[in-house]
A protein has these predicted regions:
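Alpha-helical transmembrane segments
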Residues: 24-34, 131-132, 192-195, 306-308, ...
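A juxtamembrane structural motif centered on a specific transmembrane helix
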Residues: 190-214, 218, 358-377
Length: 377
């Protein structure tokens, strides 16, 4: 990016918002047709599930954007060289591509980055509709339906947009990129929490609630461990530390390779450098990778224990789903190491972690809304 290109150029904002509105309209119209005549509560319930699905797609596309090195495909925000689409910026993109054919700015990377922004704008529009609909229902006399979860979700998606901008303008600063990933997973969790709520749902009380208390504690602990592991995985990816260990279970021929933990986990520093401006050492990258690998063993054990608890409480399909995701994570994680970080495996690894978080949140809600009867010993 040349010095004449501003980091922020708000000229194309209206056009980008219009494109986002068109993306918002498509699933909204589809849901309207599906729930025709069933009332606004049913509309919001179905729309929340659709928004959850599209947000999951957005997380996957964000992973592709990062893994294809397209994050700086348009080096300003919210547009591309001050234009709403890469078509209008084709001359600037071509000049940058001629200067660095394999650099961060190419026509393909510009389109990937802008498509990610368009989809994010569309998802933001859907969340705005959900928030407005929740408040409208409250004003129409539906006190059982919370307005604060949709309101907080709208606030959070705005925070996500800000982190998306900083990801570009701070040139893929690892801490910002990792926080952006975590924010996307948290957004999924918020939507999953709301997707299972209906106007007439009520928490389980009495003996049934007490019976499921241990399972809810286990779900919370497993979710916390998974959250830490996703953060570590994001740190591996954003620091490009995947390939420093290309064997399993050993790393560089050792079960405890040479590592520089303090340098590897110095959080506030630019990509590839320490806060002092020195190049990040190979030992630091090794520490980043190996900590994620070691944490994975603990997370796998926790998820297997959680699957057993789910089965013990007659949530058989939930247990099978969790086991399937654990297997997916193991296979894709190993593929990333021994096959040289193939794109499909890397994207599926991100998707598997996000799906696991959604499953845990949905299972938590299930224990609150339906009584659980443990299998007799």
């Amino acid at each position: 990016m040349g010095p004449e290109t501003p980091l922020y150029h708000f000229g194309p904002t209206a056009q980008i918002l219009l494109l986002g509105a068109l993306i918002t309209a498509a699933p909204l119209l589809w849901v309207l047709r599906r729930v025709q005549g069933r009332g606004p509560a049913a509309l919001l319930h179905r729309l929340t599930w659709v928004t959850l699905f599209l947000t999951f797609d957005l997380v996957l596309f964000g992973a592709y954007t990062r893994l294809s090195d397209s994050g700086l495909g348009c080096p300003d925000w919210p547009g591309c060289y001050g234009q709403a689409t890469p078509i209008g910026a084709s001359a600037q993109i071509q000049a940058a591509q001629d200067l660095m054919p394999t650099g961060p700015v190419t026509h393909g990377k510009a389109w990937v980055e802008m498509l990610h922004r368009y989809l994010a704008t569309g998802v933001g529009g859907l969340i705005l509709v959900l928030c407005a609909g929740a408040w409208w229902l409250r004003l129409q006399g539906h006190p059982k339906r919370s307005v604060w979860w949709p309101t907080f979700t709208l606030f959070w998606v705005c925070i996500q947009g800000a982190f998306g901008a900083l990801t570009v303008t701070m040139k893929l600063f690892p801490a910002i990129v990792t926080l952006h990933l975590l924010g996307g997973v948290f957004l999924l969790a918020l939507l999953a929490w709301q997707a299972t709520q209906t106007a007439d749902a009520a928490p389980v009380s009495g003996v049934a609630a007490h019976t499921g208390k241990g399972l809810r504690i286990a779900l919370a602990l497993a979710g916390g461990l998974l959250w830490v592991q996703i953060a570590l995985g994001g740190w591996v990816s954003t620091n490009y530390a995947v390939l420093v260990c290309d064997t399993f279970p050993q790393c560089q021929g050792s079960y405890w390779p040479d590592m520089a933990f303090a340098q590897g986990f110095e959080l506030w520093r630019p990509l590839g450098h320490t806060s002092w401006g020195e190049l990040l050492s190979f030992q630091a990258l090794t520490a980043i990778h190996y900590v994620h690998r070691l944490m994975a063993y603990g997370v796998i054990a926790a998820m297997l224990a959680l699957a057993w608890l789910l089965r013990h409480h007659r949530m058989h399909r939930w247990a099978l789903g969790l086991l399937a995701l654990v297997c997916l994570q193991c296979l894709t994680g190993l593929s990333n190491v021994v096959l040289g970080w193939p794109m499909p495996a890397a994207i599926l690894h991100t998707g598997g972690a996000a799906a696991m978080m959604v499953l845990i949140v949905l299972a938590w809600q299930r224990t609150r809304s339906q009584p659980l009867t443990p299998i007799a010993a």
